[in-house]
């Protein structure tokens, strides 16, 4: 049996993960990562990095009779996640802080610390599955519960990571998880789920930008696809590709943000049809098998956390980037978001959607 460190948010998923591992005979220790001061932006108690999370996790560990610790990662979280988040928006990109938090905090800093402390593995309450093939290689699969599947957020994990990770609840649906937690009298069985972006109060990232980067909110032109100025924006970081509301363009045909051009401080808008993309570039690709399947391969690509995966052809480019060609157009492919490649339920890898060249 293994000595396992379980990352616990105080919620039902990580609580049940700890309980299942203990029942399987493993030596289990719980840990909550303190990422963000509750008072810094007025966070709700339900958020995964709030102090209430540590209190809830401690209560679960006491019930299970296992050790519990809190690791402070506030400095790393600000540097690798919050500053990345702000920097992306100020450069006209739409960031995905949960992917970056997984990459830099949960599956780098925590894995490194667990190794240094002598733990054999780290477990989390993510909805995903780790499978070993006939050759002993690790594969990352979608969760059984496709509605809750989080494999998109984990695409950056490689062989060395997967060898030391456990996802105990990936084989269950959310309903089953709640029922199993209730059967074990876990206090988190009916706890409210944490929000996706834990450091954004009330879900409005614009308030964070106004506080953290007010100098980036420089007004500029809103232009149509022909380059004609038709309005003024309040600062590029306040807008995302696909946005319609809040443009202040008055009546007439609905217009959407089609592209963001930081070089000209311009917001480019057009009809809904202009949002469709059939080709885009992916940068900084990482592969679950530590290498791409081939220089050119067919797969399904997912461009947002809950988007439908679409058939695509992916081909390596001379500059190290990857060209993705979709079989049918996808609306609002947002630069800065992750594009994740799948072969059915199996994650192949993924990278970041690059900004298209703007004329």
UniProtKB/Swiss-Prot annotation:
Cellular component, GO annotation: cytoplasm
Primary subcellular site in the record, as a coarse category: cytoplasm
Molecular function terms from GO: ATP binding; tRNA binding; tRNA-uridine 2-sulfurtransferase activity
EC number: 2.8.1.13
Site residues by UniProt (Interaction with tRNA): 126, 337
Positions contributing to ATP binding: 7-14, 33, 125
Compartmental location: Cytoplasm
Catalytic activity: S-sulfanyl-L-cysteinyl-[protein] + uridine(34) in tRNA + AH2 + ATP = 2-thiouridine(34) in tRNA + L-cysteinyl-[protein] + A + AMP + diphosphate + H(+)
GO biological process: tRNA wobble position uridine thiolation
Location of region: Interaction with tRNA: 148-150
Domain of life according to the entry: Bacteria
Function: Catalyzes the 2-thiolation of uridine at the wobble position (U34) of tRNA, leading to the formation of s(2)U34.
Family, as annotated: Belongs to the MnmA/TRMU family.
HAMAP family named in the record: tRNA_thiouridyl_MnmA
Protein name: tRNA-specific 2-thiouridylase MnmA
Organism: Chloroflexus aggregans (strain MD-66 / DSM 9485)
């Amino acid at each position: 049996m293994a000595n396992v460190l379980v990352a616990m948010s105080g919620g039902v998923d990580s609580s049940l993960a700890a309980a299942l591992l203990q029942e399987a005979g493993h030596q289990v220790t719980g840990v909550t990562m303190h990422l963000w001061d509750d008072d810094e932006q007025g966070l709700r108690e339900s958020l995964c990095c709030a102090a209430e999370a540590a209190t809830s996790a401690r209560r679960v560990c006491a019930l299970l009779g296992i050790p519990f610790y809190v690791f402070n990662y506030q400095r790393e979280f600000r540097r690798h996640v919050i500053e990345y988040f702000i920097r992306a928006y100020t450069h006209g990109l739409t960031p995905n802080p949960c992917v970056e938090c997984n990459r830099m905090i949960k599956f780098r800093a925590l894995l490194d610390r667990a190794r240094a402390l002598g733990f054999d593995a780290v477990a989390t309450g993510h909805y995903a599955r780790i499978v070993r093939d006939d050759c002993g290689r690790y594969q990352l699969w979608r969760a059984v519960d496709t509605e809750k599947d989080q494999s998109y957020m984990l695409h950056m994990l490689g062989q060395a990571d997967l060898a030391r990770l456990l996802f105990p609840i990936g084989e269950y649906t959310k309903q089953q998880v709640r029922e199993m937690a209730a059967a074990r009298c876990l206090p988190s069985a009916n706890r409210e789920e944490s929000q996706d972006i834990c450091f954004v109060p009330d879900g409005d990232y614009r308030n964070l930008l106004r506080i953290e980067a007010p100098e980036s909110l420089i007004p500029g032109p809103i232009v149509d696809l022909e380059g004609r100025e038709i309005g003024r924006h309040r600062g590029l970081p306040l807008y995302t590709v696909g946005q319609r509301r809040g443009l202040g363009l008055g009546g007439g045909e609905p217009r959407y943000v089609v592209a963001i051009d930081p070089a000209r401080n311009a917001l480019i808008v057009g009809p809904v049809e202009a949002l469709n993309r059939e080709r885009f570039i992916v940068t900084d690709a990482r592969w679950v098998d530590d290498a791409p399947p081939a220089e050119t391969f067919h797969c399904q690509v997912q461009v947002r956390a809950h988007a439908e995966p679409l058939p695509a052809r992916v081909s390596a480019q001379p500059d190290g980037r990857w060209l993705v060609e979709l079989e049918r157009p996808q609306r609002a492919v947002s630069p800065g978001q992750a594009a994740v490649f799948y072969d059915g339920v199996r994650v192949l890898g993924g990278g970041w959607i690059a900004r298209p060249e703007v004329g």
